[in-house]
Each structure stands twice: as structure tokens, then as C-alpha cells.
């Protein structure tokens, strides 16, 4: 790991306020469709804090599932080798599925997860991400709910790591490399 420090990009208060808004929007969306079998799938490890907070803001009965994906390794750039290292425990056939992601960068991870889950015949599949870096997108994936659009910075905090560090920060910070 290179010598660095972390500057605040999005404050803890702003993160929590936006999650409350997203939860209300998601609740309204599914209530209007009279959906009562929502499965929320968190993509680990980065989404664990966001997942815990967003499901508490969704005012509907939900089932919780997790998948673990990997595409970063221990560096600061993503690669196209997306691996599923932990799959869902339950069946999603005929159920409405909401994928919860920490950050969308190139789009490859979400494309692979979405394709895998669609093969399992859910009734619907939607996506909510805390952070979106549209300037880095290489694969377009439809995303229904975005917390924050951010510039092309390497970010940490609120579950997101740099070489397994900084996940515990309550805010979103940008990594600044030091000379």
C-alpha cells in the first residue's frame, strides 16, 4: 500500500440523509407496484454498511441475501476479471430482487451479477448504488437508484476499502497519494 491520506468527499451526515431519501424512493416504487416479496442482495464486502442502513430505510418486508464479488484485488484500479466468490443461499425465481452495490465504476461487476441473477428468473431486478462514477463506465448497466455521482477519484469509507483498510470510516473519502 502506498503512503496516503484520506480527505472527506461526502460527509457522514450527507451519506445518512441520502440513504433515507433512497429508502423512501425504493419503498414508494415497490408499494405502488404492490410488491411484497422483495429480496435485497448486497454485494460484499463493500456494500455491507450501505446494505445495513438502506434496508432499515425500506419500509417493506424484505429478505436479505449476499453475494461476494471481486475485481480490485489489493490495488487502486479495477480489472475486468469479475469473480463470484460467494453465491446466494436462497432461490430468487419469481421474486423481486434489488441489488445493493457500494460503487459502480466500469460496470463490469454489475453486468456479470445482473446476468447471473437474470438466469435465475426473478420477477424483476433493480439496482441501487451508493456511489456512481459515470466517467469510468465501460459497460452500461441500468441503475434505478444512485446515492451520489462522484468524479474519477479512488474512494474509501462507509464499507469501501483500499487494500482492506478504511472500510470503517463513517464518511466517503478520497485517497490522496503522498510523495
Swiss-Prot record:
Keyword flag Cell membrane: no
Residues the record lists as binding diphosphate: 45-46, 167
Record flagged with keyword Amino-acid biosynthesis: no
Pathway: Purine metabolism; IMP biosynthesis via salvage pathway; IMP from hypoxanthine: step 1/1
CDD domains: PRTases_typeI
InterPro entries: HGPRT, Hxn_phspho_trans, PRibTrfase_dom, PRTase-like
Entry binding sites for Mg(2+): 101-102
Quaternary structure and partners: Homotetramer.
Protein name: Hypoxanthine phosphoribosyltransferase
This protein's encoding gene: hpt
Amino acid at each position: 500500500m502506498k503512503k496516503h491520506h484520506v480527505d472527506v468527499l461526502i460527509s457522514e451526515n450527507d451519506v445518512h440523509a441520502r440513504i433515507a431519501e433512497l429508502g423512501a424512493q425504493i419503498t414508494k416504487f415497490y408499494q405502488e407496484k404492490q410488491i411484497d416479496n422483495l429480496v435485497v442482495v448486497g454485494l460484499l464486502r463493500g456494500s455491507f454498511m450501505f446494505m445495513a442502513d438502506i434496508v432499515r430505510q425500506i419500509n417493506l418486508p424484505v429478505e436479505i441475501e449476499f453475494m461476494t464479488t471481486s475485481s480490485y484485488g489489493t490495488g487502486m484500479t479495477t480489472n475486468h476479471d469479475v469473480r463470484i466468490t460467494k453465491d446466494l443461499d436462497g432461490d430468487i425465481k419469481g421474486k423481486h430482487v434489488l441489488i445493493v452495490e457500494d460503487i459502480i465504476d466500469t460496470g463490469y461487476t454489475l453486468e456479470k451479477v445482473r446476468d447471473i441473477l437474470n438466469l435465475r428468473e426473478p420477477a424483476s431486478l433493480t439496482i441501487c448504488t451508493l456511489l456512481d462514477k459515470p466517467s469510468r463506465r465501460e459497460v452500461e448497466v441500468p441503475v434505478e437508484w444512485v446515492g451520489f455521482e462522484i468524479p474519477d477519484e479512488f474512494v474509501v469509507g462507509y464499507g469501501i476499502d483500499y487494500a482492506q483498510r478504511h472500510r470503517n470510516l463513517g464518511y466517503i473519502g478520497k485517497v490522496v497519494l503522498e510523495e
